[in-house]
């Protein structure tokens, strides 16, 4: 007989849970244990049918202040952390390590960590479901060790997170094995296609209507229509905002680099080093040497604060 487990909510000691976060549609879908089990089976090649085998752990903490985009759960004495991301970041392994530490702290809160008896903890597995608009491979592994500032022959601590691209057209085998992932990818793809022709509000409304008619996320969208529309608009606006911030940062960096380059050429010209200027234009390595030669003065130009940041 299968023993039913209660949902376990864990909090970091001394921390007030943040109840102002917004959830993503993806995570709202996986709050349904049946759908979460469907995703788990597809990823692991298993055939579990009892959703109560899952023991969901939720943790509200400062790492995710704006958007609730994760779900963690126990099954077969293993801890799984699923995270949804619409923007790629190489820093995800570190964020997951911090999150894992909080989860373990909650799980062992009543255990004697100074005692002689071994305190057992579930081994973790990390999966990132990516559906951003930046092109990424179907699957890739992100490692904590890639973030280390110093090289080591062997790493004393590492963490691997597998990132899966769940955009329409990616990971066809996974999509075939998991209906809920395919439906989510289809819904998201329609919103993005339609927003090219109309406002985000109209694009979401059209996608919701079509998906309900065609049986795509039908039950969820019927029951949570207003919430789904609000979340879709919020996710789109947040993704657009982050994309604009990256573009503005890139443009600011490009302008700073051009200022430094102009300053270098001006200094070379004052020293009558015209040949060095001509060579640097066609030789990136030589340009790098010159930038190092005039490093301090060029660096001051490159990091000149923008207006309002002084």
Where are these regions (language model features)?
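Elongated, amphipathic alpha-helical interaction scaffolds
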Residues: 1-310
């Amino acid at each position: 007989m299968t023993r039913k487990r209660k949902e376990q909510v864990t909090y970091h000691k001394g921390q007030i849970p943040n109840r102002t976060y917004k959830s993503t549609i993806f995570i709202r879908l996986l709050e349904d244990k049946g759908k979460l089990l469907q995703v788990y089976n597809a990823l692991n090649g298993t055939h579990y049918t009892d959703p109560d085998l899952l023991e969901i752990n939720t943790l509200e903490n400062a790492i995710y202040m704006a958007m609730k985009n994760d779900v963690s759960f126990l099954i077969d004495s293993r801890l799984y952390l699923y995270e949804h991301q619409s923007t790629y970041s190489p820093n995800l392994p570190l964020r997951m390590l911090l999150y894992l530490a909080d989860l373990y702290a909650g799980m062992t809160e009543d255990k004697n960590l100074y005692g002689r008896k071994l305190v057992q903890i579930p081994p973790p597995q990390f999966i990132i479901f990516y559906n951003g608009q930046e092109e990424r491979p179907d699957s890739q592994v992100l490692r904590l060790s890639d973030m280390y500032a110093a090289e080591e022959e062997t790493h004393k601590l590492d963490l691997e997170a597998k990132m899966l691209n769940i955009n329409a057209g990616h990971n066809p085998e996974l999509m075939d094995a998991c209906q809920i992932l395919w439906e989510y990818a289809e819904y998201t793809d329609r919103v993005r296609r339609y927003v090219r022709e109309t406002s985000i509000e109209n694009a979401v409304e059209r996608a919701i209507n079509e998906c309900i008619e065609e049986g795509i996320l039908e039950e969820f969208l019927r029951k949570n229509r207003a919430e789904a529309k609000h979340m879709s608009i919020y996710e789109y606006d947040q993704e657009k905002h982050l994309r604009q911030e990256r573009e503005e940062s890139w443009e600011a960096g490009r302008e700073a680099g051009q200022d430094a380059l102009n300053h270098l050429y001006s200094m070379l010209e004052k020293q009558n080093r015209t040949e060095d200027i001509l060579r640097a234009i066609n030789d990136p390595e030589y340009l790098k040497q010159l930038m190092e030669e005039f490093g301090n003065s060029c660096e001051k130009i490159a990091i000149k604060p923008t207006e309002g940041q002084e």
